[in-house]
């Protein structure tokens, strides 16, 4: 089966100078992939010419006359730039010409245009960016990582439902554990939105294990961690910054003296494995869940190596039938939730996690 992906070549901080080389390298490594390169035709052709890939049959140019800038307001992307590379790329998915879209463009614009073009799955008000973050035994699915800065309690419940469905679909787990990211484990902690979301989650039939904290993200405490996009994006980029700092410190320390350089040579295999594990670029590319089509969001600052990983996220998602499996799991889950109810004031309650004491009134995509 040929995997057909559409690439928003103009998106991100670097545009075609990053997206086109990544696309060329990807198709050369994946003979069953066909990529549609969407954007300003002259800019794309110039990059393909440099790479001697103008005649590559696995690459097709789809012209677009406009570009959504990284600082464009949502309304500009949605209402004024109707022939943007982002919108044309998403239309390829809508029309069935492609099976997934990969973009490094403006996050707010991508979410809004995706919702408009592809529409959301039944019962979902807002898409959410979800990604599998590594832990010692596998991964923890975390959402939202930046699509929704402000959320209502019911949106966090919907994110939990999507996370549940995705892990159930990918891992075959009947009842993935869910945690709500908060400043403490206690039920009384957090702002009103978090408290109300906790009530909704406890009243649902989801396997909600209570609040989790930032230090639980990489421990594997739960299968799914739910948060709003503001908190999630800060947590993600803080993690990436920390990983980069650790790599820089190790490089600096091993380069301090002749002795340390000799030790670095002896430890080189271990250091290379460490570098590979903490290189945040290989974790680039997160799914925009809740849509009737596959959309992968890359970091806007991604280089060609990182963007190639984002393309691979889309490729793997298509090969694994993620969209179809997610839609089925969401449908099955909605029946289950319908039995339990969403009303936090109802009788349906979930058992608290071990060590978590409920108030009387309260009731893993592997690395590509």
Swiss-Prot record:
One of its GO terms (biological process) is fatty acid biosynthetic process. Keywords: Cytoplasm, Lipid biosynthesis, Lipid metabolism, Phospholipid biosynthesis, Phospholipid metabolism, Transferase. One of its GO terms (molecular function) is phosphate:acyl-[acyl carrier protein] acyltransferase activity. It is found in: Cytoplasm. It catalyses: a fatty acyl-[ACP] + phosphate = an acyl phosphate + holo-[ACP]. The keyword Lipid metabolism applies. The keyword Phosphoprotein does not apply. NCBIfam families: plsX. Catalyzes the reversible formation of acyl-phosphate (acyl-PO(4)) from acyl-[acyl-carrier-protein] (acyl-ACP). This enzyme utilizes acyl-ACP as fatty acyl donor, but not acyl-CoA. Belongs to the PlsX family. This is Phosphate acyltransferase.
């Amino acid at each position: 089966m040929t995997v057909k992906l559409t690439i928003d070549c103009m998106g991100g901080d670097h545009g075609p100078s990053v997206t086109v080389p990544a696309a060329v390298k990807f198709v050369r490594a994946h003979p069953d992939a066909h990529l549609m390169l969407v954007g300003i035709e002259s800019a794309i052709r110039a990059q393909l010419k440099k790479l001697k890939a103008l005649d590559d049959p696995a690459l097709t140019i789809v012209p677009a006359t406009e570009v959504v800038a990284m600082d464009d307001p949502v309304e500009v992307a949605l209402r004024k730039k109707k022939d943007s590379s982002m919108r044309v790329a998403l239309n390829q998915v809508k029309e069935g010409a492609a099976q997934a879209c990969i973009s490094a463009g403006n996050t707010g614009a991508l979410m809004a245009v995706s919702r408009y073009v592809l529409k959301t799955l039944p019962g979902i008000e807002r898409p959410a960016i979800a990604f599998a973050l590594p832990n010692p035994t596998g991964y923890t699915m975390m959402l939202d990582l930046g699509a929704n800065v402000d959320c209502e309690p019911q949106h966090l419940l919907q994110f939990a439902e999507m996370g549940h469905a995705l892990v159930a679909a990918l891992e075959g787990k009947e009842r993935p554990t869910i945690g709500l990211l908060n400043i403490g484990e206690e039920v009384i902690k957090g702002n009103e939105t978090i408290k109300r979301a906790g009530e909704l989650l406890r009243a649902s039939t989801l396997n909600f294990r209570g609040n989790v904290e930032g230090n639980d993200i990489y421990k594997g405490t739960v299968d799914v961690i739910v948060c709003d996009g503001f908190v999630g994006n800060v947590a993600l980029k803080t993690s990436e910054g920390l990983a980069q700092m650790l790599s820089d410190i190790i490089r600096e320390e091993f380069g301090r003296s002749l002795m340390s350089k000799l030790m670095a040579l002896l430890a080189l295999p271990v250091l290379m494995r460490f570098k590979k594990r903490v290189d945040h670029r290989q974790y680039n590319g997160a799914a925009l869940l809740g849509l009737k089509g596959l959309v992968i969001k890359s970091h806007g600052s991604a280089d060609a190596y990182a963007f190639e990983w984002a393309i691979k996220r889309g490729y793997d998602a298509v090969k694994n039938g993620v969209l179809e499996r997610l839609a089925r799991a969401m449908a099955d889950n909605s029946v289950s939730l319908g039995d339990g109810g969403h009303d936090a004031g109802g009788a349906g309650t979930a058992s608290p996690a071990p060590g978590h004491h409920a108030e009387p009134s309260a009731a893993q995509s592997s690395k590509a």
